[in-house]
Amino acid sequence: MFKIDRTLAAQVVNTVKDVCGRDVNFINQSGIIFSSTDPERVGTFHEIGHQAALTGETIEVRADDNFHGTRMGINLPVYYNQTFMAVIGITGQPDEVRKYAHLAERITHLLIRERELNTISRNQADKRHFAMEALPQFRQLAQ
């Protein structure tokens, strides 16, 4: 199973920020921000992100600082093949940033799928290489 690493998360947060101009966070199941367009938030606890990860529900926050480490915005849990990947949080008025959270989710799915396909392709290439190297040995045994 694939996991979202910091490199993939950074691709998503930076791309989405370029589109919407808002801060974007990736939050793990423990509620820790592991990638963000705001470097000061990386490694900090995000209470609503943690709650969204635990419940699997999208949570909208309508005011800053009502919850520990949380700003106004939307927090969307991301699943891939029914497996929790992360929570994507986007700062701003929920009605304005909701569409960007869904965009970030779609981009994340596409990048995970791309990695999955690359791994499958690499595995098949490795198997072909092994078979081609083993073929002369099998021919010698057959003689």
Regions of interest found by a model, annotated:
Residues 2-143:
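Hydrophobic, helix-rich cores of sensory/ligand-binding and other regulatory modules
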